[in-house]
């Protein structure tokens, strides 16, 4: 290693060379160490003790050029001393622009504490390509450290430059959940999650369901469930209707006609009238009343039976699978009319 080229002593150069030869050696000082040791010693003129971090006008270079300027070679982070840029003549912002873009401060300046004592501040900046305010964000990040009580204008700062490899053109940096939203929603409907306690995802689902969109979704689910229940009821009514038609056939043969419409007692102990259309009641009653007198023959009887068929086909609540039984019963009644 050319120690003159990098401007460091032989001891420092030997240490840096060892860090590149032996796996596990890494220069990664903490926030407190950067301020309390490196930055303070730099400001006190103790250059030899901090020569591992070079002086560099960061804003004269693009961020992708900075790794080559670092004394300690690394794949993840690089450190530099730099004078904080002067403010613009008529503004409060520091000059942090390069030829191709600018460093934009994000969030508030935060205190750095050593124990309970505040020893400095830390500010985070993100590099954007282009010019404000339409710059395009990149994956280059810089943390700027300053000693407490020092004038901000032209103050010496130490910078930690990093590249966020997980960042991808402004998209989410986190991998998607292993389970889809449909599976998660099913788990919420069935009860608690596998861990037994509500997760952040469950809380998010609850928050969504509490909103207007969630209420609409729940209403649609309730309607679907209600429709399913109606279909089951229709099958049940169809069975009862089939039994009652058979009973009507027996009543015809014995000469006893029913005077009451059959009823159904629901699970809630409420009495409900079966959904027999009025047209069917009238046509069937007419046939039963006219059958003993045998006044209608031939064409008239055929018309009556035809109207009864039309009425039967108008019953929407009867399951299609039961039509074979109903048609058979009506055919039997028709045969009785013609045989007698």
UniProtKB/Swiss-Prot annotation:
InterPro entries: NAC-dom, NAC_dom_sf. Its main location: cytoplasm. Residues 119-170 bind DNA. Residues 167-198 are annotated as: Disordered. Residues 21-164 form the NAC domain. Pfam families: NAM (PF02365). GO terms for cellular component: endoplasmic reticulum; nucleus. It is found in: Cytoplasm; Nucleus. Keywords: Cytoplasm, DNA-binding, Nucleus, Transcription, Transcription regulation. The keyword Nucleus applies. One of its GO terms (molecular function) is transcription cis-regulatory region binding. Residues 167-181 have a biased composition (Polar residues). GO terms for biological process: negative regulation of flower development; plant-type hypersensitive response; positive regulation of DNA-templated transcription; response to endoplasmic reticulum stress. Interacts with PAS1. The NAC domain includes a DNA-binding domain and a dimerization domain. This is NAC domain-containing protein 89. It comes from Arabidopsis thaliana (Mouse-ear cress).
């Amino acid at each position: 290693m050319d120690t003159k080229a990098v401007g460091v002593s032989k001891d420092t150069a030997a240490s840096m060379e060892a860090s590149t030869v032996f796996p596990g050696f890494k220069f990664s000082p903490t926030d407190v160490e950067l301020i309390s040791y490196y930055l303070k010693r730099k400001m006190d003129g103790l250059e030899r003790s901090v020569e591992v971090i070079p002086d560099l006008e960061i804003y004269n270079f693009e961020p992708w050029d900075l790794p080559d300027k670092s004394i300690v070679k690394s794949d993840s982070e690089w450190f530099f001393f730099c004078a904080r840029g002067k403010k613009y003549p008529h503004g409060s912002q520091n000059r942090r622009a390069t030829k191709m873009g600018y460093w934009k401060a994000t969030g508030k300046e935060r205190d750095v504490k050593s124990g309970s004592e505040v020893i400095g501040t830390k500010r985070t900046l993100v590099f954007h390509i282009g010019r404000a305010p339409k710059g395009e964000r990149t994956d280059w990040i810089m943390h700027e450290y300053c000693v407490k009580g020092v004038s901000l204008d032209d103050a010496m700062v130490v910078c930690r430059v990093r590249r966020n490899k997980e960042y991808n053109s402004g998209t989410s940096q986190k991998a998607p959940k292993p389970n889809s939203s449909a599976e998660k929603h099913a788990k919420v409907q069935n009860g608690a999650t596998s861990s037994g306690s509500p997760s952040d995802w469950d809380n998010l689902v609850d928050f969504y369901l509490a909103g207007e969109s969630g209420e609409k979704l729940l209403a649609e689910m309730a309607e679907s469930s209600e429709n399913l229940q109606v279909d089951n009821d229709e099958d049940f009514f169809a069975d009862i209707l089939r039994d009652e038609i058979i009973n009507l056939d027996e009543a015809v043969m014995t000469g006893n006609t029913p005077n009451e419409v059959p009823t159904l007692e629901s699970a809630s102990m409420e009495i409900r009238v079966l959904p027999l259309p009025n047209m069917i009641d009238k046509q069937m009653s007419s046939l039963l009343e006219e059958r003993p007198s045998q006044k209608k023959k031939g064409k008239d009887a055929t018309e009556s039976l035809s109207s009864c068929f039309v009425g039967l086909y108008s019953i929407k609540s009867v399951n299609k699978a039961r039509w074979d039984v109903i048609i058979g019963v009506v055919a039997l009644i028709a045969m009785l009319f013609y045989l007698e």
